């Protein structure tokens, strides 16, 4: 996907360190994208100053300015047809919009156009034509959604640093915009909103709006999608208990027994990788993608890894972190540090093109396929929710649990508090009552001990008095 034209944009991002964590929320992702857009805008404005210095040095009576994501030519010109000559000079200062985007390529185009306009002014041959009246720009605006989708990647990475994470985000935006819009429709706000309105499912509509919003920002299409910005209520989930998780992992061995003999020799042992993946999701509460993006296998198997942490790579959704296990004994019970399984992981990843996010996504989707294959009653992400709920029940502070899962405290509480099932709530309440009962017992025993201590103190005082009396 990269070429020389794109290189200069990525070079402009060389001194930018993107926010290491988006906190897992849409707001966090938006702030990260905004940081990168502002960084690129600063670079463009710096280069714009240089362009205007060159134009001034060449005594060109034209300057370039930025306005709302576009570049305009500013010059004093003959009165435009239909305009009033308020000063009586026959001339007036105008800002000409030629549909030039405010990016590095646009600066080059704008500078060339400024020199061309300057020559017309100097020769006194300027005339108001379709180009300078903005009519050609209007024609250019009449592009279809399909036309813009073809240029989406090129334009998107003019304002975003290219990383594994941003490639994945772009794939998300592109695929949903392509899926939910008609490529033959003109790329207008009205048509894009109509596309969203035709989506029946609430979550699909919400996700489509997020993607189309990014599409519109990229192509400077004015659109109001605020009515679709509220996250829908979550559907109910089947969050597994610890007992169900322990039972679930045995279903992979059950599959081995029941699958039959007609199995391709190359994949006959592949179930072991997905059993291992199941175990890692359960123990660490990982996002499925965090297993497959640049896994630090050497660290996982290292003797120095005494805390048995899994290192999540910086290219993942919320940056790098070390995830700690809950139920550390499951690591041995599930045989998660067996080099054989890690070798299978490395082999599976090596067969994929890391720059092709459809292929990485295919790996994570394969987990869901195996969950259905072995007839588990829950989904991969439910193991992450189970980790969060288990942490809460065990009394782990919200901040520590949120950090371990790689998101903010706000996301943690908003996301996971709602998943407490009746059984989970009963367990949490019973454990709290048990702790309270234990406290009451200790308090009663302490009160009894205080009474006994007071009785013994008085007994000692009495004995002292008797001894003193006998010796007198």
Swiss-Prot record:
CDD domains: INT_Rci_Hp1_C. One of its GO terms (molecular function) is DNA binding. Keywords: DNA excision, DNA recombination, Heterocyst. It comes from the Bacteria. InterPro entries: DNA_brk_join_enz (IPR011010), Integrase-like_cat_sf (IPR013762), Integrase_catalytic (IPR002104). The active site is at 287, 317, 384, 407, 416 (o-(3'-phospho-dna)-tyrosine intermediate). Residues 244-429 form the Tyr recombinase domain. PROSITE patterns: TYR_RECOMBINASE (PS51898). Coiled coil: none annotated. GO terms for biological process: DNA integration; DNA recombination; DNA repair; heterocyst development; nitrogen fixation. The keyword Nucleotide-binding does not apply. The keyword Ubl conjugation does not apply. Essential for DNA excision. Site specific recombinase necessary for the excision of the 11 kb nifD element during heterocyst differentiation. Belongs to the XisA/XisC recombinase family. This is Excisase A. The gene is xisA.
